[in-house]
Amino acid sequence: MALSFKNSSGSIKAKRIKDGLVNANDIETTVIDFSYEKPDLSSVDGFSLKSLLSSDGWHIVVAYQCVTNSEQLNNNKKNNKTQKFRLFTFDIIVIPGLKPNKSKNVVSYNRFMALCIGMICYHKKWKVFNWTRKSYEDNTSTIDFNEDEDFMNKLAMSAGFSKEHKYHWFYSTGFEYTFDIFPAEVIAMSLFRWSHRVELKIKYTHESDLVEPMVRQLTKKGTISDVMDIIGKSTIAKRYEEIVKDRSSTGIGTKYNDVLDEFKEIIKKINSSSLDSTIKDCLKDIEE
């Protein structure tokens, strides 16, 4: 049975779908000029992060590589390139601007990154939320893998999350789509991005833009107040404390203040006769 995948530019057609999987050979993973075709059952969403993470044959190294090279992958997305990655025994096909569809392995870029985040956090032994029991529990991953020292999340590093920080691999594009398994973490990280938006130089039109992706995932589970109660506000607060703990403030504002403090100490050591009018004017506001 043929299947069309709708994205912002039109649609991409695959020859067949079997057991929810599309064969990567049926879709050319390169830049494509899309022509519009009416998608089949585009309103049906077959994506399930939890289901994919229960798949066999993990290629965890690919997840680490993708987050490490996320800047290049994001540029490919911006250039409208379709990409494929062997995360499991089957390929994950990434189509820019993809709309929900009934395939579980043809996904948008943000959902793909969420899948990489989920795999890495499973590997790091993060607890997973059970919506039926309304509590966190151990994940079932038993994969044994030692990550390469060259692997790192550059975006997280720029936000002050060192490689040793628990949230180093979580702070990445698409983290909101891990809500099904890490709801408290997603809410807490969204709160962190909002409260540190100036330091992180996050571009936005309205403050609501900073939490909108999280809210979209949250409301799939129920009303905001009900879902917050299910997860537990105290649990969310603890996750926020984990996020800000031991984080290096790398924002330019903090660096600026640090430099000014150093300047003040240097000024004290300079002979007053060497402080010409120009430097005095520059340092006047600092001294005040």
From Swiss-Prot:
It is found in: Virion. GO terms for cellular component: viral capsid. Keywords: Acetylation, Capsid protein, Virion. Disulfide bonds: none annotated. The modification N-acetylalanine is found at A2. Its main location: virion. Belongs to the high plain virus capsid family. This is Capsid protein. The lineage of its organism: Viruses, Riboviria, dsRNA viruses, High Plains virus.
